[in-house]
Amino acid sequence: MLKKKILLWIDYSFLHFGIANYFSKLNYDLFGIVDSEESINNFLQNQKIVSFSKLWYLYENLSPSQPDMAYLKIIEEKYQINLWSIIYTDRYFYNKFNPFYKFEYNEILSLIEQECKLFEKILSESEPDFILTNTITHHYQYLFYKICKSKGIPLLTLEPLRFANKWMITNGPMYDDLDISNFNKSKSVQLSNNDINKLSTSSGKIYLKNKLIKTEISKSKKFSAIFNFI
């Protein structure tokens, strides 16, 4: 029986490195995209905790060059995406929000081109059955999601509900392709103050749509996990 392949997006939080550690004990092939600084790259290259089939280091694959406009046009047609609509989602490309560096037109397109080439290479080599990532906060994560969505590859994000300690697993950004017209059809739920207090003080849980998939973790298991990690 062939192993299922999981591609994980690993950043400085190490959240998905921990998730990879869990899946490493099961029958899965693990791959990773590393979106972090050099010190963390060095750790991942030398650690013996999780065995990855392959890791790709995002920033090591990006360097200034003249953009290939023909290639970018092919990408837009191939995946049915508007690259500028993705670029506009990233605050770092705006002078107002990024006083440290002003990106030029060609620099932005060059970055997008190299990111597309890297993502196509990663997906071609890893052929993942599904992808696990954190909250999508940068243009390149959103670009990666759009490519995966076009290719029909499930991409699951772990999203904070911003209420107590609740989290939700979603199929991409929570509000992607949001149909505002449905708001008028949705039913509001009235909660009492007692209900709200219970929700805000209860232990963290993870939800998939309306189904609870993980209940609270006991204190003994938490301590056991700490000692196992150490």
Regions found by a protein language model. Name each.
Residues 117-181:
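Conserved nucleotide-sugar donor-interacting segment of glycosyltransferase catalytic cores
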Residues 2-13, 34, 132:
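Nucleotide-activated donor-dependent transferases that construct or modify glycoconjugates
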Residues 2-4, 27, 127-128:
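A general structural motif
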Residues 15-18, 40, 139-142:
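Short, well-ordered alpha-helical microsegments
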Residues 22-116, 160-230:
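Conserved N-terminal ligand/cofactor-binding loop architecture of enzyme catalytic domains
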Residues 18-19, 118:
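A conserved donor-nucleotide-binding helix/loop in the catalytic core
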